[in-house]
C-alpha cells in the first residue's frame, strides 16, 4: 500500500487551480520522477475539473486509484495511491486535510493561490503519516487486530482438534454438555450453514 500524491486544489470555472501538493515518487527511477510528478499534477487537476461540487469519487487508472473530494465551497483534494490502499482511509485523509487547510488559509486566497504563495505546510506530514493506513487510521488498526484475532482463534481451534476429528463429533460425544446445549449447538450450526454461499 502506497500513497504517491496528496493535493489541494480550487475548482475554478473552468480550470482547477493547484494550491498545494506533496509527492512521494521515491519508488520511481530518478529520471522518471519529474515526469511522474507532472503527470500526477495534471491528473489531479483534470479529475477536479470533471467532478461536481459536493462529490467524492475514486477513479482507477491501471494499478493506481485517484480519490477526489470536491467540497461545495469549491475546495478540493486528490489522493493518488496504489489500488490496494483503502479508499475509506483516503477519504478520511482528504476530509482532514481540507478542513485543516480551510482553517489556515483565507478563502479569498483560494481562487488566485499557487503552491508558491499558499502558506500551508501540513501536506508532507500527512503524506508520510498516512503511508501506513493502519497506523494513521484507528478504524483500520482495529480491523487489522480483529482479523489477526480471527486467524489466531481459527488456528487455535484447529490445533485443538486431532487429525480427522471434527467439532460436531466432539459435541455429540461430550458428557459435559447437556442435551439442551447440544441442541443449541446443532441449531446454531444449521443456521450458519444455511446462509453460507456455496
Swiss-Prot record:
Q: Which Gene Ontology MF annotations are present?
A: protein-cysteine S-palmitoyltransferase activity; SNAP receptor activity
| GO cellular component terms listed in the entry, alphabetical order | apical dendrite; basal dendrite; cytoplasmic vesicle membrane; cytosol; endoplasmic reticulum; endosome; Golgi membrane; mitochondrion
Q: Does the keyword Ribonucleoprotein apply?
A: no
Lipid moiety-binding region (S-farnesyl cysteine): 195
Cross-referenced PROSITE patterns: LONGIN (PS50859), V_SNARE (PS50892)
Q: Where in the cell is it found?
A: Cytoplasm, Cytosol; Cytoplasmic vesicle membrane; Golgi apparatus membrane
Keywords noted in UniProt: Coiled coil, Cytoplasm, Cytoplasmic vesicle, ER-Golgi transport, Golgi apparatus, Lipoprotein, Membrane, Methylation, Palmitate, Phosphoprotein, Prenylation, Protein transport, Transferase, Transport
What's any GO biological process attached to this entry? endoplasmic reticulum to Golgi vesicle-mediated transport
Recorded hits in SUPFAM superfamilies, A to Z, give: SNARE fusion complex, SNARE-like
Q: Which residues form the v-SNARE coiled-coil homology domain?
A: 138-198
Protein's UniProt keywords contain Cytoplasm: yes
PTM comment:
Palmitoylated; catalyzes its own palmitoylation. Palmitoylation is required for Golgi targeting. Farnesylation is required for Golgi targeting.
Quoted from the entry, the domain comment is:
The longin domain regulates palmitoylation and membrane targeting.
What name goes with this protein?
Answer: Synaptobrevin homolog YKT6
